[in-house]
Curated annotation (Swiss-Prot):
Residues that bind heme b: H89
Residues where N-acetylalanine is found: A2
EC number(s) reported in the record: 1.7.-.-, 1.11.1.-
Localisation: Cytoplasm, Sarcoplasm
Protein name: Myoglobin
Keyword Iron: yes
Entries under PROSITE patterns matching the protein: GLOBIN (PS01033)
UniProt keyword Acetylation present: yes
GO BP, sorted A to Z: removal of superoxide radicals
Length: 149
């Protein structure tokens, strides 16, 4: 079970730095899963060094983290934003659902590195539980849509 209050407490502390956090998450995703970069049209075919401080990665970082933040702030009552997120990723972006698990796992690691005092063991467990819940609900949407990607 996710401790949504703990997750939101850390999220609030991080929000002022959302672009940098998002950049670090995306760069780590691309480093660990290079094939994932192909799902971001403005970011594909560029080296990590080229991407590091571009306007494109900053914009994508904001988009990704703000969408995730909108879901996190629902404290588990996130069916509407999850449905909307899944719908665009199924029909427009065609991103396989396992990438949500990958990026949220990376997010826990990046947050732990960037906010070590806030991301203690309890907070890491809370985020892992929250992200597991979110990813599970996203996967249900993919299954309902019979995603073949």
């Amino acid at each position: 079970m996710a401790d949504w209050d703990k997750v939101n407490s850390v999220w609030s502390a991080m929000e002022a730095n959302i672009t940098a956090v998002g950049q670090n998450i995306l760069l780590r995703l691309f480093e660990q899963y290079p094939e994932s970069q192909s799902y971001f049209p403005k970011l594909k075919n560029k080296s990590l060094g080229e991407l590091k401080d571009t306007a494109d990665i900053k914009a994508q970082a904001d988009t990704v983290l703000k969408a995730l933040g909108n879901i996190v702030k629902k404290k588990g009552n996130h069916s509407q934003p999850v449905k909307a997120l899944a719908a665009t990723h199924i029909t427009t972006h065609k991103i396989p659902p396992h990438y949500f698990t990958k990026i949220t796992t990376i997010a826990v690691g990046v947050l732990s590195e960037m906010y070590p005092s806030e991301m203690n063991a309890q907070a890491q467990e809370a985020f892992s539980g929250a992200f597991k819940s979110i990813c599970s609900d996203i996967e249900k949407e993919y299954k309902a849509a019979n995603f073949q990607g």
